[in-house]
């Protein structure tokens, strides 16, 4: 085994020694203090052999020696322990990175790409007050998806996806800038107080106020029919949102509601969705951690398995939080989308037939009038039009989570 020290080293008492000239043996360390790792406590200093501290990836050890893992067999030779710990830690590190990247990519794909056709159908059903079929069943949603793709192609199910990313980017950017200038907390720590909660929710509310015109433009792109309109440009959402604020651009109908009327229901829906999803997420994580006791790190393969298992509770918590928030706020979302789409001269696909178009000519005066009109003309189930799309969306999400877990469990078993 060849030493991995450099040929030249400007350390203290090095160049003048015979070892520094290359014609002597390796001298023992003469420091009078025990070496410690950054993560070690006072009673664990005897487990380390390096000085200065053993930084992961460094080679400042004795020739042929490496830092043993805590809890490893102290009777084993230093070379054997070092080789075993190095191979297991390097393999675990690669698998952890691969697992984190793959699981994050699968979650991102599911939430933003795979779920988008369900979001398109869900919004079209919500704003279609002409519809006689409420599309409450997932089977009817699958049937209408097939009809749309047959007449317009697969592109019709992913319309407006670019604008949704733009709205998310505007939301994140606005939140960061507002937090920087107003010093409102973006996140809550464990020692929160009512003042911090109020400031945090105020920040979220201000973000939803800024996003409101762009959300309207994005909603139009996701529900308008591909039969009538051409594909919008990538930045059309930005231009239409700014034009909505400045009263410029395409002329709208007189029934168009002003942004001040749309701001309150938009902020209300956003704040309630955030509160519900955050509460459900923390509760699910609490019960999962309480149900599965913490495991002490063992050998390399078990450590990798434990590390992989740490990813999925958070994904499950996010899944449950989004599902509960979407289900509980579905009636309010239906009202919100109808108010946003009113007066925009939007023509949508006929969700009853799948091969025709219908115009949106509603005449709601505000939030309260929209609720009363839906209840009077469409009944209580009118607030849940297109609910089958939610069932399809989260069923696909659950399937992807399960497949991802099976794949990475197989990877870990193969590596071990």
UniProtKB/Swiss-Prot annotation:
Q: Where is this region: Disordered?
A: 1-91
Q: Which residue ranges run through the membrane?
A: 101-121, 161-181, 197-217, 256-276, 312-332, 381-401
InterPro entries, alphabetized: Mitochondrial_sb/sol_carrier, Mt_carrier_dom_sf, SLC25A46
Which residue ranges contain the repeat Solcar? 94-185, 309-414
Could you name the domain of life of the organism this protein comes from?
Eukaryota
**Listed Basic and acidic residues bias regions:** 1-13
**One GO CC annotation:** mitochondrial outer membrane
Biased composition of type Low complexity is found at 82-91
Topological type in the membrane: Multi-pass membrane protein
Q: What does this protein do?
A: May play a role in mitochondrial dynamics by controlling mitochondrial membrane fission.
Q: What is this protein called?
A: Solute carrier family 25 member 46
Provide the species name.
Xenopus tropicalis
Underlying gene: slc25a46
